[in-house]
Amino acid sequence: ASPPEVNCSQYNRKGSGITCSKEWKPICGIDHKTYSNECMFCQLNQNKRFQLRKLHDNKCQIECTNYSAICTMEYFPLCGSDGQEYSNKCLFCNEVVKRRGTLFLAKYGQC
C-alpha cells in the first residue's frame, strides 16, 4: 500500500504563495529528505520540475541530503529494502538517489 499523496493545493494562498506553521509533524519524501510537516514539503517542492511524493510519515531513517558521488571504503553496513547489503551510508545513498526513492533502509548492519 503506497502512502497517500500530499494535497498541496490546500496550502496555496492566492497571490501570497504558501505560508506554513512551525508544527512538527514530519514526513519523509521520496528524495529521502525529512520535511517538518506537509505544508513545508509543499512549499519547498513547489518549483521542482518533477512531482515529489511522500514516502512515509515520520522522519526519514537515513538522511541522504549530503551524500557524495565518490565514497570512502569505510565499513558500516546497511541492509536495503532490496535485500542488498551496502558497505556504508554513502554507497546506500547513491543507490537511493539512483532509484529515485524506491529503496529504503531495512535495517542497520548486515542483511
UniProtKB/Swiss-Prot annotation:
Disulfide bonds: C8-C42, C20-C39, C28-C60, C64-C93, C71-C90, C79-C111
Lineage top rank: taxon: Eukaryota
Gene3D superfamilies: 3.30.60.30
Domain spans labelled Kazal-like: 2-62, 63-111
GO MF, one annotated term: serine-type endopeptidase inhibitor activity
PROSITE patterns: KAZAL_1 (PS00282), KAZAL_2 (PS51465)
Site residues (Reactive bond 2 for elastase), renumbered to this chain: M73, E74
CDD domains per the UniProt record, alphabetical: KAZAL_FS
Residues marked Reactive bond 1 for trypsin (site): K22, E23
UniProt keyword terms in alphabetical order: Disulfide bond, Protease inhibitor, Repeat, Secreted, Serine protease inhibitor
An example Gene Ontology CC term for this record: extracellular region
Cellular compartments annotated: Secreted
InterPro entries: Bifunctional_prot_inhibitor (IPR051597), Kazal_dom (IPR002350), Kazal_dom_sf (IPR036058), Prot_inh_Kazal-m (IPR001239)
Reported function: This inhibitor is composed of two homologous actively inhibiting halves: one which inhibits trypsin, the other which inhibits elastase.
Protein name: Double-headed protease inhibitor, submandibular gland
Biological classification of the source: Eukaryota, Metazoa, Chordata, Craniata, Vertebrata
